[in-house]
Swiss-Prot record:
HAMAP family per UniProt: UPF0102
GO molecular function, one term: nucleic acid binding
Protein's UniProt name: UPF0102 protein HEAR0176
One Pfam family hit: UPF0102
SUPFAM superfamilies: Restriction endonuclease-like (SSF52980)
Organism annotation: Herminiimonas arsenicoxydans
CDD domains in the cross-refs: PoNe_Nuclease (cd20736)
Family: Belongs to the UPF0102 family.
Signal peptide range: none
């Protein structure tokens, strides 16, 4: 059940920037021929920004956006702990399927205006 609009907390600047990054990533991946299955899948184990389909492969996408490359940039912010949470969330997502499809974990790293698509960035 969703809360009425007047009860929702205002979104932070960080959440707004994150949403914009996800929007950019989604448009880019759709132009590359991937189809959106689900956005912002949340479960007890974690969250997956985008679940896409690339042919017969299910793709779990983590989107990271940074204003600059300080502190290693967007890709470096996908820590081992974050990777574990993504894998747990993906396992929960895959419980929907009797015969889970092939899958992979990609990262879309956006540093300022530069976007990098890192396929198979996380191994489960």
């Amino acid at each position: 059940m969703r809360l009425p609009t007047f009860l929702k907390r205002p979104r932070t600047a960080r959440q707004i920037v994150g949403q914009m990054g996800e929007d950019e990533a989604l448009r880019y991946l759709q132009k590359q021929g991937l189809a959106l299955i689900e956005r912002n899948f949340r479960c007890k184990g974690g969250e997956i920004d985008l679940v896409m389909q690339d042919g017969d492969t299910l793709v779990f996408v983590e989107v990271r956006k940074r204003a600059d490359k300080n502190h290693g940039g967007a890709a470096a912010s996908v820590t081992p702990e974050k990777q574990k949470r993504l894998i747990v969330a993906a396992h929960i997502f895959l419980q929907r399927y009797k015969m889970p499809p092939a899958c992979r974990f990609d990262v879309i790293a956006i540093d300022a205006t530069e976007m990098n698509w890192l396929k198979n960035a996380i191994e489960s």
